[in-house]
């Protein structure tokens, strides 16, 4: 159903496609080109930036909240990076 590709946007990690049609981009990349760390990259292209720190993961959810609109960038970040 979903296909993930390295993003064509310089400040995003992934582009999401649904049935071949672009849906959304998600995951942050700093202005210097370095990806922000995530808890665990389930897609795997940025797994060297996994931190696996439970407390940091909890702080992320405290800042951003646990609820996300279906098929939004936040939804995919929560499902595939956090």
Set out the residue ranges of the language-model regions.
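Arg/Lys-rich, low-complexity, intrinsically disordered basic segments
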Residues: 1-82
